[in-house]
C-alpha cells in the first residue's frame, strides 16, 4: 500500500501541471514604433504557439510551469520584415531560473535590438539576436 502512495506523490510532483512548480509568464513587447508589426512564432518541445502578428505598441504573452528537471526552454522566431528573421530563447531554464525570470520574463523589441528584464536586479539588458539566413528558393 505504501508504494502506491509513493507512486501517486511522484506522479504529482513530476507533472508539469502540478501546483508544485510556479507559473512563469513570458511577455514579448513590440516597441519598434511607427506602426511596424513583428511576426512571432514561439515553441518548446511540448508546445507550439503558432505564428502571431504583434503590432507596434502591443504585446503577446504565454505562461507555463517549469518541468521537474528544469530543462524547459521556449525558442521564438521573429519576422522583422519580409527579408529579415531573428531568433532568441524567450525562456531558457539554465539561464533564467536563477532570478532573471523568477515569475515573469519580459522582453522588449526595439529598433536597436532586443531587451530582457532581469527581475532580480531590476534592470533591462540588451540581448543578441540570432540572425537567420534566408535560403534561396524558399520564402
Curated annotation (Swiss-Prot):
Alphabetically sorted, this entry's keywords are: Glycoprotein, Secreted, Self-incompatibility, Signal
Disulfide-bond pairs as recorded: none
Query: What top-level branch of life does the organism fall under?
Result: Eukaryota
Subcellular localization is given as:
Secreted
Signal peptide stretch:
1-19
**Which Pfam families does this UniProt record tie to the protein?**
Self-incomp_S1
Classification via InterPro entries: Self-incomp_S1
From the UniProt record, give one GO term of the biological process aspect: rejection of self pollen
Q: What is one term from the GO cellular component aspect held by the record?
A: extracellular region
- Main subcellular location: secreted
Known post-translational modifications? Glycosylated (S1b) and unglocosylated (S1a) forms coexist.
Its family? Belongs to the plant self-incompatibility (S1) protein family.
* Known function: Exhibits specific pollen self-inhibitory activity thus preventing self-fertilization.
Known glycosylation sites: 51
Q: List the protein's name.
A: Self-incompatibility protein S1
Organs and tissues of expression: Accumulates in the stigma (at protein level).
